[in-house]
Amino acid sequence: MAAKKKILLVSATIGKNYELAQELKEIIDNTTAVDTAVINLVSYDLPLYKPGIETKNETASELSSEFENADGFIFCAPEYNGGLPPILTNAFTWISVTTANWRDGFKNKYAVIATSSAGSGQRFLVSFRSQLEYMGTLVMPKTITVTNGQSLKRKSAERTLHNLTHLLSK
């Protein structure tokens, strides 16, 4: 029997995006047989990565292991100054320098991008898609967006998550 696939839900905040990650986890857990885990990047308390510093960091290695052991991802993060939140960029940098090959945590894995932002989050969604694809991640075409004026469209989210879990089961 094949091992169960694992989706890692990654939140870049302890607020609304963490709540969104928990809600998306609940949808997956209630509709599929895929294993899920939610992590909050804030809890890792990674130091700011600076080129030339020692890359042997136990916390970063633990985070890298989480990424390497996942089959797919759901990233929940807000738009921050028209792009990615710094905590997400910092985490990705640490992952890329603590794996054997800098893309090992990302390549050939599927991902859904989700955002809970004050506005549309479009600048984040576009720039993050580009970064994930560069890292070798296969990003689902449909995103999940929650704004101050629009709550989660549950049926739409269920379809998007179903498509992700369907691809993982192949």
Predicted feature descriptions by range:
Residues 1-3, 32, 138-170:
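Glycine-rich phosphate/pyrophosphate-binding loop and the adjoining helix
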Residues 2-32:
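N-terminal beta1-alpha1 ligand-phosphate binding loop
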Residues 12-14, 41, 116:
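Cofactor-binding loop segments of dinucleotide-utilizing enzymes, especially the Rossmann-like FAD-
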Residues 29-34, 104, 136:
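Short helix-capping segments at alpha-helix termini
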Residues 36-38:
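Generic structural signal for residues in well-ordered beta-strands
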Residues 40-43, 105, 109-110, 143-148:
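A short, structured active-site edge motif that brings together acidic residues
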Residues 41-58:
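N-terminal beta-loop-helix "entrance" segment that forms/cooperates
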Residues 58-135:
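Helix-loop-strand module that forms the ligand-binding subsite of alpha/beta enzymes
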